[in-house]
């Protein structure tokens, strides 16, 4: 893959994409799970026939490539994210998951290279979350141009456009465009396995099978180079060169208390432990306290004795 994007044209492969992470954008989240489902455009141009009365969820195409991975995030998951996704740093460590590293980035590239080009990543709310987060993870590895050969579209934007085109004069309450709401609106049921990366990808594919030919035309006209996506948050040079901790190391660090003593050779902050004084100084300080008290008592006795001598006898 070169640094230049391929010329615009019919997208040959749509890669439905979703990520779960440790939290919302303001918290600089890290990926905990990702899934990519590659579908050739011919599978959408000639969709399989649904079985049963409408609305029936269409079956996925027979020929797909899928990559699904859980990832050690290297930081704690927010309680809300853990409750929604069922993933936490401790759970991922217990299963020996690895961080988002060069190996994972190369795996993503190898997966993409197996697909007919041009490719287009399709993610729900991708412009605001999945795409910038993926760019941030790649930037941590110094690979901001790794996906310059790919294109991308946000399925929310696409589905809004398709709904407006099909019913331009429709009035009524404002519709929700969350993945679950659209799925329920189309098929009369909740999507299975919500808030798992694979479950959300399959739900998105089913939604895009609603009007596949119209979707393909919209994607061909509006896909933009993935290289135009800015990372969700800035990455410093030191962060790029700093080794990423393993899941086991991260979990052990999160579990330790703040007053745990460092091991030999480790450098802790200056606020963690008070400076160690010279043993001789400690012994001198221990002697000075009783000597000072003895001096005060001696002075008091001498004063009383002097007063007794100055007082006339009976």
UniProtKB/Swiss-Prot annotation:
Disease implicated: Aicardi-Goutieres syndrome 1: A form of Aicardi-Goutieres syndrome, a genetically heterogeneous disease characterized by cerebral atrophy, leukoencephalopathy, intracranial calcifications, chronic cerebrospinal fluid (CSF) lymphocytosis, increased CSF alpha-interferon, and negative serologic investigations for common prenatal infection. Clinical features as thrombocytopenia, hepatosplenomegaly and elevated hepatic transaminases along with intermittent fever may erroneously suggest an infective process. Systemic lupus erythematosus: A chronic, relapsing, inflammatory, and often febrile multisystemic disorder of connective tissue, characterized principally by involvement of the skin, joints, kidneys and serosal membranes. It is of unknown etiology, but is thought to represent a failure of the regulatory mechanisms of the autoimmune system. The disease is marked by a wide range of system dysfunctions, an elevated erythrocyte sedimentation rate, and the formation of LE cells in the blood or bone marrow.
Name of this chain's protein: Three-prime repair exonuclease 1
Expression by tissue: Detected in thymus, spleen, liver, brain, heart, small intestine and colon.
Co-factor binding details: Binds 2 Mg(2+) per subunit. The second magnesium ion interacts with only one residue. Substitution with Mn(2+) results in partial activity.
SUPFAM superfamilies linked to this entry: Ribonuclease H-like
TM helices/strands, residue ranges: none
Membrane topology: Peripheral membrane protein
PANTHER family per record: THREE PRIME REPAIR EXONUCLEASE 1, 2, THREE-PRIME REPAIR EXONUCLEASE 1
Effect of residue 271 to R: Reduces ubiquitination. Strongly reduces ubiquitination
Reaction catalysed by this enzyme: Exonucleolytic cleavage in the 3'- to 5'-direction to yield nucleoside 5'-phosphates
UniProt record, GO biological process: activation of immune response; apoptotic cell clearance; atrial cardiac muscle tissue development; blood vessel development; cellular response to gamma radiation; cellular response to hydroxyurea; cellular response to interferon-beta; cellular response to reactive oxygen species
Region (Interaction with UBQLN1), start-end ranges: 243-314
Required cofactor names: Mg(2+)
Biased composition (Low complexity): 247-260
In-chain residues carrying the UniProt-annotated modification Phosphoserine: 78, 167, 261
Task of the protein: Major cellular 3'-to-5' DNA exonuclease which digests single-stranded DNA (ssDNA) and double-stranded DNA (dsDNA) with mismatched 3' termini. Prevents cell-intrinsic initiation of autoimmunity. Acts by metabolizing DNA fragments from endogenous retroelements, including L1, LTR and SINE elements. Plays a key role in degradation of DNA fragments at cytosolic micronuclei arising from genome instability: its association with the endoplasmic reticulum membrane directs TREX1 to ruptured micronuclei, leading to micronuclear DNA degradation.
Location in the cell: Nucleus; Cytoplasm, Cytosol; Endoplasmic reticulum membrane
An example Gene Ontology molecular-function term: double-stranded DNA 3'-5' DNA exonuclease activity
Residue span of region Necessary for cytoplasmic retention: 281-314
Effect upon mutating residue 160 to R: Reduces ubiquitination
Outcome, altering residue 303 to P: In AGS1; decreases ubiquitination levels; decreases colocalization with UBQLN1; no effect on exonuclease activity
E.C. designation(s): 3.1.11.2
